[in-house]
Design a protein with these regions (language model features):
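Active-site-adjacent loops and short helices of periplasmic peptidoglycan-processing enzymes
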Residues: 1-107, 114-119
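Domain-terminus/edge residues, biased toward the C-terminal soluble/receptor-binding domains
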Residues: 86-87, 98-222
Length: 222
């Protein structure tokens, strides 16, 4: 989502652009938004399918539209990762599906998530939407914390046999925002319970403090 948001902000693509769906995108396995080969789908709907429905088909369709092919998009992903300082991340595909050479760390996921929240707030609004209907198929957002905790406004679930049940969650209470990353959980319930505990701990024992006012000159020591 970060790269697509950046491309939109730079006017390289538009949310209203219509993307021709390839056979590769259409036949993706795992969670899908159920796009159809040969049809055109807007970037806006593909983003919703990616963020809300965790659609692997949407991920590939967007990758192909932005870069021409998924493999070239992966190269772009790794360039962005380097710029963002994601030192323990190497992408091999656009979906996060298992690959022996595809890896990241919980810290890098937190850094990436924070960058998306800070740099593209209007795009981040998508992550709190609870459902999306496409092709008459209604799917709920897989992030159940959106229903459990009203301060939670994102972000993303994930699951593979190797990584277990994962969740990046973000919440804001008063003027303080927290981002949590849970990986390797043994069940769907476990990842949400662990994330909720981390959020409660963070909001209880930490506080945001303003050290300086913005746009004010500091006194020189000389």
């Amino acid at each position: 989502g970060y790269i697509v948001a950046d491309q939109i902000e730079q006017d390289m693509i538009s949310k209203d652009d219509n993307v021709l769906i390839s056979r590769k995108a259409w036949k993706m396995e795992g969670s899908r938004m159920f796009i159809e080969v040969g049809k055109r789908v807007s970037v806006k709907d593909l983003l919703k399918g990616l963020v809300i429905q965790s659609g692997n088909d949407a991920a590939v369709a967007l990758a192909e539209y932005v870069a021409g092919s998924e493999q070239i998009f992966v190269d772009v992903m790794n360039e962005y990762a380097s710029v963002l300082g994601l030192r323990n991340t190497l992408f091999q595909n656009s979906t996060g599906l298992p690959d022996a050479d595809h890896f990241t760390s919980v810290r890098d996921l937190a850094v990436l998530s924070r960058a998306l929240i800070d740099e593209f707030p209007s795009h981040y609004d998508l992550y709190k939407e609870k459902e999306f209907t496409f092709n008459n198929i209604r799917q709920l957002n897989r992030n159940k914390l959106l229903w459990r905790d009203e301060s939670v406004d994102g972000m993303k679930t994930g699951h593979t046999e190797a990584a277990g049940y994962c969740l990046i969650a973000s919440a804001k209470r008063n003027d303080m925002r927290l981002v949590t990353v849970v990986a390797g959980s043994k069940s769907d319930k476990e990842r949400f319970d662990a994330s909720q505990r981390l959020l409660e701990y963070g909001f209880r024992f930490y506080a945001a403090q303003k050290l300086l006012e913005g746009n004010k000159e500091l006194k020189s020591s000389t």
